[in-house]
């Protein structure tokens, strides 16, 4: 287990416990051979890990001295309000848990994410130095690949695929590229200036996923969820802007503010008859057209 994984394990152990003594932390560590070789955690090692965690993650592990010496995360909001940090910590924590339970490998099922590790590492290096990247790319709807320079702005994980948002130098347009469709990628010595007003979260704030474009404007959308789908909508919102308008025995109305792009429409269709678009009328009509086209495929059965 790497040193980073040990730090993540300690953060996760304290987060899940709320408050926990050093003795209990050491006891849990001793039960994990990869972490300890069954040896106790010394106070010196614990303090060193605690300081490293603050240095690397900005996470403060404090001690409550009244009623016993119990350690806790002093600033949990720094984790909960930072989506990237929370995702990273949760991902490492899950990885650690699975690593501790490899004997259950035939009883743990995960979705396969198209490999993007090598490209992702190079792109992050390019983003660190604002360096132009030369990519060879073949889109799903293309018969051949093309090589061109891009200025990498940000990367995004969406529905088990990694995507790159970049400025296409040749077309002078912002485009999105799937990392699993990149055939080759090369760092160049050319650099670029990231626009001062660019914000990755801001750019995607009114989009459902990775389909973007100036031709579709964000708007207020009301979606009605029926029966058993209501708690699913509450527990896993469609979008960060989602809010509950009203709830009844048979249905609940939710509001989102976003651009009704292709991937959002596909998400609504995926839910079937458990939801209904109430407004705007234009999106409701689009849904009717898709449903009508689907009906045509099956009407002769």
Task: Identify the residue ranges that each predicted region occupies.
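Polybasic (Lys/Arg-rich)
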Residues: 205-301
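Residue-level signal for tight coil/turn positions that link beta-strands
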Residues: 65-66, 152, 159, 179, ...
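Bulky hydrophobic/aromatic content
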Residues: 8, 22, 57, 62-139
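Short, hydrophobic/amphipathic alpha-helical patches that form generic packing surfaces
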Residues: 6-13, 89-93, 265-270
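Core beta-strand-centered patch of the WYL/Sm-like small regulatory domain
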Residues: 107-222
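Short, basic/aromatic recognition patches that contact phosphate-bearing ligands
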Residues: 1-83, 293-301
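Short aromatic/basic micro-patch
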Residues: 19, 149, 176, 255, ...
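General beta-strand recognition
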Residues: 70, 134, 163-165, 253, ...
